[in-house]
């Protein structure tokens, strides 16, 4: 009889376990997850460029790692082209990334909405220049000229094609008279110096470098290229799956990003030195003080991804043929966590 009572008691315990949905260790695992003690490696993409200033300063000062705590590890992955970074996202090799809005839009489209923009990083910071011996004064004078951009479909390329359209011009592939070529920024400098291209639309610090190192003329400054400079040059993207599983990690990452944006804007000289140190460490080449100062004057370090401009870029991508059709942009920009962070810090939320 005593044995039957023991068996009955064990059966009741088992039944309770089934109905509560817990095995012997399930409760402790759930409490660990809710307490944020699971170890997660967060793979973050970035460029060694001043347009990714928050990433560079954050790397140098360990800001993101401190924000995420000891239970998680930041793993930085360096890229030099947005297309390569998007490929890594599509392969599931990245979780969060600093990137240009053009590639971000492409990633959102190719992933069928799995890649989302969750914050801005920098605005503007691109200029249109011509080689020193050409008296190009405006966009109309690009008629019959060869113009370089860093990459087809990126922010500078879309901006250039917009400018051409606004001035009654088209590129040669569309039956127009302007030849658009793509080349890496260092190669654009060489091509301009050797008179193998006539003009270029490039991001900082390359705009300042072309002016100071090969005597390029500024045709349009940063605030004349598009929307008076109120357009994104770099944004933060995340895999939706990662965001859903690790919203707390993404929120803490954004807290660090917002703090870094404030720090850079309030301590521009000190921050530019930190950025330059990171660029030197990563590329083995430093920027001169005058180029760095000139470049930063053309940039706006911000948390705002300029949603309206980003949506307009989608339309430009369709118009120029980089996207076959416009995707549903409803989930392209997700500012819920960013606005939560901004509200907690007493800062204005972004619409």
Regions inferred by a protein language model and the residue ranges of each:
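Short, low-complexity disordered leader/linker segments with a strong preference
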Residues: 1-41, 345-351
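Short, glycine-/small- and polar/acidic-enriched structural segments
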Residues: 32-181, 198-201, 219
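Extracytoplasmic/secreted envelope proteins and their assembly/folding machinery
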Residues: 52, 56, 61, 86, ...
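Short, solvent-exposed loop/beta-turn-alpha elements that line the ligand-binding surface or hinge
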Residues: 62-72, 223-228, 296-306
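Short, surface-exposed acidic
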Residues: 73-74, 171-177, 280-293, 324-331
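Pocket-lining segment of extracytoplasmic ligand-binding domains
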Residues: 111, 174-177, 181, 186-278
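Secondary-structure end/capping motifs
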Residues: 244-324
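Conserved C-terminal helix/tail region of periplasmic/extracytoplasmic solute-binding proteins
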Residues: 315-351
